[in-house]
From Swiss-Prot:
Protein name: Uracil-DNA glycosylase
Subcellular location: Cytoplasm
Reactions the enzyme catalyzes: Hydrolyzes single-stranded DNA or mismatched double-stranded DNA and polynucleotides, releasing free uracil
Sorted UniProt keywords: Cytoplasm, DNA damage, DNA repair, Hydrolase
């Protein structure tokens, strides 16, 4: 793809890891992305507080390059409370109380693999091992859940999933809840493993279908079957 000087300049301003930037070039230059940039600029002009901080918006992709992805855990949008969101789905910054969904994830991990329940909720260690912790929508206004839906992020993260679906094989996609499962309908089940369960939020998990889903052991079993190093799910203290 031959880029004009203007297109190259536009791409240079995107703070995105190079392997992802190359694979997503056509989307990053699309009207969807232009519209999304305009929306975020207007939000900042209106002095709205946006989470996560701008340098962390692409954290999931920047920490886990395209060729390193082994697992995708798909979330919906970032936490909307102060100092929570760090650009990784379900993850929070150290020193912040564990959100209920993450507590339930840790409980299931302990039941499934005997991994001690972590005192912090920073999942960076998972991301560094190849777990792409991808929200469908990458920003949110403080205190306003779903406020940045339908502004272009969904199309961007669809493009991320399409790149993984087409360019890679033997990735485990973990889809908790109906929202993630709808988004995951585009995944080729012959090339990849798709694991589904209820959402870990207390409302959904307590109705059944999350606890006992054993996605962590199933993930590692599949990776090992395909000669891929399994994930060490235990977080540092």
């Amino acid at each position: 793809m031959q880029l004009t000087e203007q297109q190259q300049d536009k791409l240079s301003k995107v703070q995105l890891e190079e392997s992802w930037k190359r694979s997503l070039t056509s989307f990053l230059l699309s009207p969807y992305m232009d519209s999304l940039r305009d929306f975020l600029f207007q939000q900042k002009q209106a002095q709205k507080t946006i989470y996560p901080p701008s340098k962390q918006i692409f954290n999931a992709l920047n920490i886990t390059p395209l060729d390193h992805v082994k697992v995708v855990i798909l979330g919906q949008d970032p936490y909307h409370g102060p100092n929570q969101a760090n650009g990784l789905s379900f993850s929070v910054q150290r020193g912040v109380a564990l959100p209920p969904s993450l507590r339930n994830i840790f409980h299931e991990l302990h039941t499934d693999l005997g991994v001690p329940v972590s005192r912090h909720g920073d999942l960076t260690k998972w991301a560094e091992q190849g777990v792409l912790l991808l929200n469908s929508v990458l920003t949110v206004e403080a205190g306003q859940p779903t406020s940045h839906h339908k502004q272009g992020w969904e199309e961007f993260t669809d493009a991320v999933i399409d790149v993984l679906n087409e360019q890679r094989e033997h990735i485990v996609f973990i889809l908790w809840g109906a929202y993630a499962q709808r988004k995951g309908q585009r995944i080729n089940r012959e090339k990849h493993l798709v694991l589904t369960a209820a959402h870990p939020s207390p409302l959904a998990a307590n109705r059944g279908g999350f606890f006992g889903c054993k996605v962590f052991s199933k993930t590692n079993q599949y990776l090992k079957q395909h000669g891929i190093e399994p994930i060490d799910w235990q977080l540092d203290a």
